[in-house]
């Protein structure tokens, strides 16, 4: 995978099953592949929710374009009742994207 995006939000740990179920259903639709998502991994740590998206290339533009798609709106509405922004100044999707500040790759990779 050449591209990764890590989104960070807040979530009550008790709601993890609901969020996972929403994405499990969503990932059976055509939309993730249309956007270019190759892998999705959800993490939780106390009240933090981390959403790792992996793709072959940068998908953020396609992700923004998909916001008007009914399947995107459906999953967003479902998980939106369980997730809240981490940052108080959150305005849009990109405001929850973690910034890479160090990366290492083994020489033989």
From Swiss-Prot:
Changing residue 40 to G: Relative activity reduced to 10% of wild-type. This is Tetracenomycin F2 cyclase. It holds the Pfam family Cyclase_polyket. SUPFAM superfamilies: Dimeric alpha+beta barrel. It comes from Streptomyces glaucescens. Catalyzing the conversion of tetracenomycin F2 to tetracenomycin F1. Gene3D superfamilies: Dimeric alpha+beta barrel. One of its GO terms (molecular function) is lyase activity. It catalyses: tetracenomycin F2 + H(+) = tetracenomycin F1 + H2O. Pathway: Antibiotic biosynthesis; tetracenomycin C biosynthesis. Changing residue 51 to A: Relative activity reduced to 16% of wild-type. Its EC number is 4.2.1.154. Changing residue 26 to A: Relative activity reduced to 15% of wild-type. Homodimer. Changing residue 40 to K: Relative activity reduced to 16% of wild-type. GO terms for biological process: antibiotic biosynthetic process; polyketide biosynthetic process. Keywords: Antibiotic biosynthesis, Lyase. InterPro entries: Dimeric_a/b-barrel (IPR011008), Polyketide_synth_cyclase (IPR006765), Polyketide_synth_cyclase_sf (IPR038474). Optimum pH is 6-6.5.
């Amino acid at each position: 995978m050449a591209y990764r995006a890590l989104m960070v939000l807040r979530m009550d740990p008790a709601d993890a099953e609901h969020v996972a179920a929403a994405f499990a259903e969503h990932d059976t639709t055509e939309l993730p592949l249309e956007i270019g998502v190759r892998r999705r991994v959800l993490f939780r740590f106390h009240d933090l929710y981390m959403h790792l998206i992996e793709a072959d290339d940068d998908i953020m533009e396609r992700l923004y374009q998909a916001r008007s798609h009914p399947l995107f709106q459906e999953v967003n509405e479902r998980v939106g009742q369980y997730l809240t922004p981490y940052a108080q100044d959150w305005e849009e999707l990109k405001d929850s994207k973690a910034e890479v500040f160090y990366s290492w790759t083994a020489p033989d990779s």
